[in-house]
């Protein structure tokens, strides 16, 4: 059966409060749409933790910088609904708002512009009434993806806060492929006293091991074949660590060389503490090896946890 689709914030809140008044637990799976098996696995996980599952589909302009093409982000809403219906148990509601940043008094469209501090803000082109309140995890947002995408996690933390306030879930499920994002949301929930349980779902991979991502569609067939150097080198590094090679620089060099030889362009390759995301020189406890690399127009990320 097709899920209920809600686009209005007040209607979404009303639905959630009605369900919770009946004693139902609600799990939220936030997405930007163009769903793949990785997203569907989050929905399946959500069913294990709640009575009802809500999926949000919203391409968040707040996490895009002026140099990133927001309009080019892939979308297929009807296809997304069909995929959600294929999951056992389906979903109970899809929250698909038009614009969560449109605060203009005359209904003008929100647009992304570059502020004086070099970061994106959503403002209303016509009236000047815009969004200027942001949520930030000051330390966790700076390493890894934060170096090359300085506005990204501010946008993520803010939109997730808005979704939490609108949907009012008991549980929220995030994929650990976006490891830094997952850690930031965990910290945000703790620091801001949200009464929400945050679940981290394991990375879902293609048959050849490539981490599933909506951005994989940007890869040419040749680039797609070469991109598996990311996951293959990460798994080799984990095996080397388990065999006693715990010097991080040597493991990083192994991964960088493999990806570079395959034609990739490294954004970062770092081994960090699983909790605070700080770099480590030697593996002496739980760490995560995080990689970001470009193949053609696609910027891909992946990671692997190493627990020695």
From Swiss-Prot:
Name used for this protein in its record: Pantoate--beta-alanine ligase
HAMAP family in the record: PanC
GO molecular function terms noted in the UniProt entry: ATP binding; pantoate-beta-alanine ligase activity
Stated pH dependence: Optimum pH is 7.8. Activity decreases sharply with increasing acidity and is null at pH 7. There is only a slight decrease toward higher pH.
Organism: Lotus japonicus (Lotus corniculatus var. japonicus)
Expression sites by tissue: Expressed at low levels in leaf and root.
GO biological processes: pantothenate biosynthetic process
Keyword Ligase (UniProt): yes
Subcellular localization: Cytoplasm
Entry keyword Repeat: no
Lineage: Eukaryota, Viridiplantae, Streptophyta, Embryophyta, Tracheophyta
């Amino acid at each position: 059966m097709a899920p209920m689709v809600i686009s209005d914030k007040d209607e979404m809140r009303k639905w959630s409060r009605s369900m919770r008044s009946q004693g139902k637990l609600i799990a939220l799976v936030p997405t930007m749409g163009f769903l793949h098996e990785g997203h569907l696995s989050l929905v399946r996980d959500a069913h294990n933790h709640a009575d009802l599952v809500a999926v949000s589909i919203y391409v968040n302009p707040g996490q895009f910088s002026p140099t990133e093409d927001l309009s080019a982000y892939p979308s297929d809403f009807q296809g997304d609904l069909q995929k959600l219906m294929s999951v056992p148990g389906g979903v109970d509601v899809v929250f698909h708002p038009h614009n969560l940043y449109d605060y203009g008094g005359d209904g003008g469209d929100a647009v992304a512009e570059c502020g004086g501090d070099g970061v994106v803000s959503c403002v209303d082109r016509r009236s000047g009434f815009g969004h200027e309140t942001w949520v930030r995890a000051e330390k966790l947002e700076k390493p890894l993806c934060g170096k090359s995408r300085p506005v990204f996690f501010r946008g993520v933390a803010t939109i997730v806060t808005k979704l939490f306030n609108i949907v009012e879930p008991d549980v929220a499920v995030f994929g650990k492929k976006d490891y830094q994002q997952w850690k930031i949301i965990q910290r945000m929930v703790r620091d801001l006293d949200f009464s929400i349980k945050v679940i981290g779902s394991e990375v879902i991979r293609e048959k050849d091991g490539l981490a599933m991502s909506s951005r994989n569609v940007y890869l040419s067939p040749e680039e797609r074949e070469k991109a598996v150097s990311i996951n293959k080198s990460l798994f080799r590094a984990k095996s080397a660590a388990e065999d006693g090679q715990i010097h991080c620089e040597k493991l990083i060099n192994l991964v960088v060389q493999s990806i570079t030889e395959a034609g990739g362009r490294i954004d970062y390759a770092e081994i960090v503490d699983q909790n605070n995301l700080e770099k480590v020189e030697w593996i002496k406890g739980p760490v995560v090896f995080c990689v970001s690399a470009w193949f053609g127009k696609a910027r891909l990320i992946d990671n692997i946890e190493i627990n020695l």
